[in-house]
Amino acid sequence: MTTTAPASETQTFTVTEEINVRASLEQTFASLVANMGRLNEAPDGTALPMVLEPHPGGRWYRDLGGDNGHLWGFVQSIKRPVLLEIWGPLFMSTAATSNLLYRLTETPEGTLIKFTHTLVGPFPEDHRPRLASGWAALHARVRKAAETAAK
């Protein structure tokens, strides 16, 4: 027997952040790619190595070894060193999908990163507070690594 349920109201959630980095566009973009990939960590500092294939259609996934892992998304668009856009389910095990948008612009002090994460679809209420803090932790590592490389 097949049953259908009426669709509920579409849920959307958006996280935005602006990050000022005292490093060049190139250093900041390289730090972003590295820290979203092999240098990734959970907010508590636990290693969470990911693979980010930085080209259109490239995958962003957690490689657990032995052909096991978790697909987080695909590179939707990339224009080095000013744009990185990723689309996919990220860490959600629901029907939700996300769009991550990083726009980098040169400033007199270095680089400004404008970040937007838009999530559409069902997702647990208890995930909402952790979304912003997780991205903030990643962005702090990106800034620190880029600024260290700039010295």
List the model feature ranges, each with a label:
Residues 1-16:
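Short acidic N-proximal helix/loop "leader" segments that mark the beginning
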Residues 16, 23, 34-71, 81-83:
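Short beta-edge strand/loop motif at the mouth of beta-sheet-based domains
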Residues 17-19, 71-77, 89, 98-106:
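Hydrophobic/aromatic beta-strand elements that line small-molecule binding cavities or substrate pockets
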Residues 21-26, 76-82, 103-112:
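A short, structured loop/turn motif at beta-sheet edges
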Residues 28-32, 60, 75, 86, ...:
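Hydrophobic pocket/interface hotspot
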Residues 67, 92-96:
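Short glycine/serine/proline-enriched coil/turn segments at secondary-structure junctions
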Residues 90-93, 116-122:
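Short, solvent-exposed aromatic-acidic interface loops
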Residues 119-151:
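A conserved amphipathic terminal alpha-helix motif
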